[in-house]
UniProtKB/Swiss-Prot annotation:
UniProt record, GO biological process: tRNA threonylcarbamoyladenosine modification
Disordered as annotated region, ranges: 87-120
Family classification: Belongs to the CGI121/TPRKB family.
Protein task: Component of the EKC/KEOPS complex that is required for the formation of a threonylcarbamoyl group on adenosine at position 37 (t(6)A37) in tRNAs that read codons beginning with adenine. The complex is probably involved in the transfer of the threonylcarbamoyl moiety of threonylcarbamoyl-AMP (TC-AMP) to the N6 group of A37. CGI121 acts as an allosteric effector that regulates the t(6)A activity of the complex. The EKC/KEOPS complex also promotes both telomere uncapping and telomere elongation. The complex is required for efficient recruitment of transcriptional coactivators.
A cellular component annotation (GO) from this entry: EKC/KEOPS complex
Subunit: Component of the EKC/KEOPS complex composed of at least BUD32, CGI121, GON7, KAE1 and PCC1; the whole complex dimerizes.
Protein's name in the database: EKC/KEOPS complex subunit CGI121
Broad class of the protein's primary localization: nucleus
Sorted UniProt keywords: Activator, Chromosome, Nucleus, Telomere, Transcription, Transcription regulation, tRNA processing
InterPro entries linked: CGI121/TPRKB, CGI121/TPRKB_sf
Domain of life: Eukaryota
Length: 229
């Protein structure tokens, strides 16, 4: 599991934890828990939702770790918009791919703030950012955990000061699978599905040595500029 600190955002959401699991055996049970938790009420419902308070992403549709990180950063930037004047030009992709947001002009991070989202919460907003279209139902179906998911990326929008060990233990209590390093993400990429979703078939016709890298760049760029255009 990797952890990233984004101090410019409200402390309740400023620590991001991402983990990659392969050979996941309980995807249907994860989906069932998510659905049941969303329908429960009272203290029991609060506890059930806290136990599955993660973003679950179909890892076979991720082309790199940067793909996920850019979607996470874009989600936070949309949820907690800047209060300063808008920049004349959008930041270069290289700045987003290696995000340093400490200098961004954001609303006060000392206040408890609720994120602004177009969907139900930050987790579904993340799935929407990963999708090339704005159909929330479609983005959840494609990019969220499904009954046949075996490679799963798990995201925690955590609080400043959260113990990394406790976050990981909470993930393991939900996901039955093998934790692997993010350097292995590209091994599981389902390029046939990625090509269809992001409409990359024209790049396949190039048949150049760096075709895969060009497609990877195209996917990341699509996610990076989604909230700009």
């Amino acid at each position: 599991m990797e952890t990233y600190a984004y101090p410019a955002f409200p402390p309740e959401y400023s620590n991001i934890h991402i983990a990659l699991f392969k050979n996941v055996t309980n995807a249907p049970q994860i989906r069932k828990r998510l659905i049941e938790a969303s329908q429960m009420t009272g203290p029991e419902g609060d506890k059930a939702r806290e136990e599955v308070d993660f973003g679950f992403v179909e890892a076979n549709l991720l082309v790199s770790k940067e793909h996920l990180l850019i979607a996470i950063l874009s989600t936070l930037l949309y949820a907690f918009p800047s209060t300063g004047p808008a920049p004349t030009d959008p930041p270069p992709l290289s700045d987003i791919a290696d995000p340093d947001v400490s200098s961004l002009s954001l609303s006060s991070s000392s206040e408890t703030r609720q994120p602004k989202t177009r969907s139900h919460n930050l987790h579904s907003e993340l799935l929407l950012l990963l999708s090339p279209n704005n159909n929330i139902t479609d983005s959840i179906r494609r990019h969220g955990v499904s009954d046949i998911t075996t490679n799963l990326a798990v995201v925690k929008f955590g609080k400043r000061g959260d113990r990394v060990e406790e976050v990981y233990e909470a993930m393991k209590n939900v996901v039955e699978g093998e934790l692997i390093g993010w350097e292995g993400i590209s091994e599981g990429t389902d390029w046939a599905r990625v090509d269809k979703i992001y409409k990359l078939n024209e790049l396949n016709a190039l048949k150049t040595a760096d075709m895969v890298e060009k497609k990877r760049t195209a996917v990341i760029s699509t996610v990076a500029i989604k909230n700009v255009i």
